[in-house]
């Protein structure tokens, strides 16, 4: 089978290897689609956390079960599935509290063990979620990022009627816009430097989309009091955006840190947080929102067509990574069709 391998920082190679055999409690999955996440790009550049070289990347995927090793999951053979990247123990205090991304023995598909940028992969049966037959596999590869967005919105406690601004309109940012609406909130503005991504946000009904220049969102909120948000969700990870989120949100409001970049230190003035009595809260990963994300996508309540902007065969991995890294041609998500 073909498999993309990250061997070292900025060194990706397409390999041919045997189809892996599932260990006890695992399933063999034939991958259909895998989208390229911002964390994959940071991993490629060597500036991510908790990863191991060499490894097959990829954690936003869909596919179908070919085989299982053991009695559990036998009913999944032949079914279309997605899967949680989080390989947690299920028994530690963090897992028991519903925060598996903080597991004391955490592993992650596509980071510490081989992921979905391959024609086949092995996945713990416990991580698999079956898909309804009506949900296309291309759409289903966005279950994981949608779960990330739902988890972030819920961690910030967005309630009906609240106004929310989103910083960054890449894949996660555009899903945050729709997740806020699912919870009854109103997205009043998006800040994004790439024109095509701003256009995608406007197409989703966001009333205002400003550029990524420092101060653009703050200027908007000062010129239009109705645009002052109760919550700002920062999804870009850029250092200046964190401080701008703190300045743009209303006094007593909440700031959610969803994106981050290890290679650059964020700048946040504590006095703004203290004087405005703000709540700043972080969110990472899908949490426990995987099943809901499957149901939401199957219902058609969230549109992912604007996210999946550039399709590639695995043979074209170099171009896929380049387009995603440069955000060329309005790229929001490069994705691989593993069955092309």
Curated annotation (Swiss-Prot):
Pathway: Metabolic intermediate biosynthesis; 2-deoxystreptamine biosynthesis; 2-deoxystreptamine from D-glucose 6-phosphate: step 3/4; Antibiotic biosynthesis; neomycin biosynthesis. It comes from the Bacteria. It is an enzyme of class 1 (oxidoreductase). Its EC number is 1.1.1.329. Belongs to the zinc-containing alcohol dehydrogenase family. DOIA dehydrogenase subfamily. Its cofactor is Zn(2+). One of its GO terms (molecular function) is metal ion binding. Binds 2 Zn(2+) ions per subunit. This is 2-deoxy-scyllo-inosamine dehydrogenase. It comes from Streptomyces fradiae. Keywords: Metal-binding, NAD, NADP, Oxidoreductase, Zinc. Zn(2+) 1 binds at residues 37, 59, 144. Zn(2+) 2 binds at residues 89, 92, 95, 103. Pfam families: ADH_N, ADH_zinc_N.
């Amino acid at each position: 089978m073909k498999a993309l391998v990250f061997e070292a920082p900025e060194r990706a190679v397409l390999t041919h290897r045997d189809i892996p055999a599932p260990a006890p409690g695992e399933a063999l999955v034939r991958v259909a689609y895998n989208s390229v996440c911002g964390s994959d790009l940071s991993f490629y550049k060597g500036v991510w956390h908790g990863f191991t070289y060499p490894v097959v990347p990829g954690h936003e995927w869909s596919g179908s079960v070919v085989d299982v090793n053991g009695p559990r999951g036998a009913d999944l053979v032949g079914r279309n599935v997605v899967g949680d990247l989080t390989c947690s123990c299920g028994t530690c205090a963090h897992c028991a509290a519903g925060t598996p991304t903080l597991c004391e023995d955490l592993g992650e598909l596509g980071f510490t063990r081989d992921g979905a940028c391959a024609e086949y992969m092995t996945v713990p049966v416990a991580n698999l979620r079956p898909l309804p037959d009506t949900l296309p596999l291309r759409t289903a590869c966005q279950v994981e990022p949608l779960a990330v967005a739902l988890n972030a919105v819920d961690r910030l406690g967005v309630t009906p009627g609240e106004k929310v601004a989103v910083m960054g309109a890449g894949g996660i940012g555009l899903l945050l816009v729709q997740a806020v609406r699912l919870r009854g909130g109103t997205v009043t503005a998006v800040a994004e430097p790439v024109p095509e991504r701003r256009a995608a946000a406007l197409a989703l009904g966001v009333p205002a989309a400003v550029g990524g220049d420092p101060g653009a969102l703050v200027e908007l909120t000062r010129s239009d009091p109705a645009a002052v948000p109760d919550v700002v969700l920062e999804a870009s990870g850029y250092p200046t955006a964190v401080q701008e989120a703190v300045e743009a949100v209303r006094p007593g409001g909440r700031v959610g840190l969803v994106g981050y970049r290890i290679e650059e230190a964020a700048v946040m003035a504590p006095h703004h947080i203290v004087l405005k009595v703000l709540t700043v809260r972080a969110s990472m990963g899908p949490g426990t929102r995987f099943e809901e994300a499957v149901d939401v996508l199957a219902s058609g309540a969230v549109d992912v067509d604007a996210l999946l902007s550039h399709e590639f065969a695995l043979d074209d991995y170099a171009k896929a990574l380049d387009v995603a890294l440069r955000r060329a041609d309005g790229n929001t998500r490069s994705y691989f069709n593993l069955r092309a």
